[in-house]
From Swiss-Prot:
GO cellular component terms, A-Z: endoplasmic reticulum; endoplasmic reticulum membrane
Keyword Membrane: yes
Any one of the GO BP annotations: very long-chain fatty acid biosynthetic process
Catalytic reactions of this protein: a very-long-chain (3R)-3-hydroxyacyl-CoA + NADP(+) = a very-long-chain 3-oxoacyl-CoA + NADPH + H(+)
Main location per the UniProt record: endoplasmic reticulum
Gene source species: Eremothecium gossypii (strain ATCC 10895 / CBS 109.51 / FGSC 9923 / NRRL Y-1056) (Yeast)
Protein name listed in UniProt: Very-long-chain 3-oxoacyl-CoA reductase
InterPro entries in the record: 3_ketoreductase_fungal, NAD(P)-bd_dom_sf, Sc_DH/Rdtase_CS, SDR_fam
């Protein structure tokens, strides 16, 4: 018969064994979760590399290219919108060019018709004015034409970074009217035609909307613009679910800076492509997420933007305090430089 000390000793061993089992189980769980996370991270990086360098470009025949189909592009007179029009025409789409400056639209129309031998038509409208007649005119422009592609490119931002409380009512309303109201109204006008034409031509329809890193990351000193683009992300993803049963693909395209009048950046770099390079990557990546690995119906197509998006999303997080603070400092610096430049110009005029 064992002593009490022997019984206590064995009880202690059993307790240690039980604890070791629990500790080992926790360690294995942690290891498994870490391994899965690391594997997912590496596979996503490989996916980004393949999608930006190796995989073939998307085919546009399924949207009616070279079959008489039309693509409607808003904000088509300059920058990214102009490149969408040119590159869609090069793929065999007839194009409908909608923007404010008629002279630029007519010049682009002649260039497209001469270079790509497709039909091009123009409509000059001011999306900054919320007028129902604008959307009636767009409906009449489309008429009986087989429009299967809509590119929502039109957009505006703040003239310079500014705090929300100092943003003028005119600028605030202008941003919401162009970025949100106009985009929704154009889509509500054109998407039913896209659905009907896709069914009639036995092809798919496409609705592309230009988003921004300003909507991906809450951006201090661009609060209204940032909110307007974040709205488009949620709206576009919801619309994708609604139009999928109608054989219409919906995707929002996210970009960081691109050389353009809106960004006020003139020199291209590895992180800041030209509109031509950005649109080329967008059209090549259609239907893929590239840098937007965890976001439905979303694409961050340009290679450096894709890496930037993916790393932010998987490290500090797009809604983190750190990302917000970095964004604030970045745009505060831009504001200081813009104000100094304005002061110099004012001084030069007085002289």
């Amino acid at each position: 018969m064992g002593s009490l000390s022997d019984i206590s000793f064995f009880d202690h061993l059993q307790e240690l064994a039980r604890r070791d089992c629990c500790v080992n189980a926790l360690l294995w769980c942690a290891f498994t979760v870490g391994a899965v996370k690391l594997t997912t991270f590496m596979l996503s990086l490989i996916s980004i590399a393949l999608e930006t360098t190796v995989l073939p470009s998307a085919s546009y025949k399924k949207y009616g290219a070279r079959k008489g189909a039309y693509a409607l592009v808003t904000g088509a007179s300059d920058g990214i919108g102009k490149e969408f029009a040119l590159q869609l025409a090069s793929k065999g789409f007839n194009v409908l060019l909608v923007s404010r400056t008629e002279a630029k639209l007519l010049e682009l129309k002649q260039e497209i018709m001469a270079k790509y031998k497709v039909d091009a038509r123009v409509l000059s409208v001011d999306f900054g004015v919320d007028n129902r007649l604008t959307y009636t005119a767009i409906s009449e422009l489309c008429g009986e034409l087989p429009v299967t592609v809509l590119v929502n490119n039109v957009g505006v931002s703040h003239s310079i970074p500014v705090s929300f409380l100092e943003t003028t009512e005119e600028e605030l309303r202008g941003i919401i009217t162009v970025n949100n109201t106009a985009t929704l109204m154009v889509t509500q006008t054109v998407a039913p035609l896209v659905i009907a034409n896709a069914r009639r031509l036995q092809c798919r329809g496409l609705v592309l909307t230009m988003g921004s890193f300003g909507g991906l990351l809450p951006t201090p000193l661009l609060a209204t613009y940032s909110g307007s683009k974040a709205f488009l992300q949620a709206w576009s993803a919801a619309l994708a679910g609604e139009l999928a049963p109608h054989n219409v693909d919906v995707q929002i395209v996210l970009s960081y800076l691109v050389t353009s009048a809106m960004s006020k950046v003139r020199r291209a770099s590895a992180l800041i492509p030209t509109p031509r390079a950005f649109v080329r990557s967008t059209l090549a990546s259609l239907g893929r997420r590239v840098g937007a690995q965890e976001r439905y119906a979303t694409c961050t197509p340009y290679w450096s933007h894709a890496l930037y998006h993916f790393l932010i999303e998987n490290t500090v997080g797009v809604h983190s305090r750190l990302a917000n603070a970095i964004n604030y400092r970045f745009h505060a610096d831009i504001r200081k430089r813009a104000l100094r430049k304005a002061a110099r110009k004012a001084a030069e005029k007085q002289e």
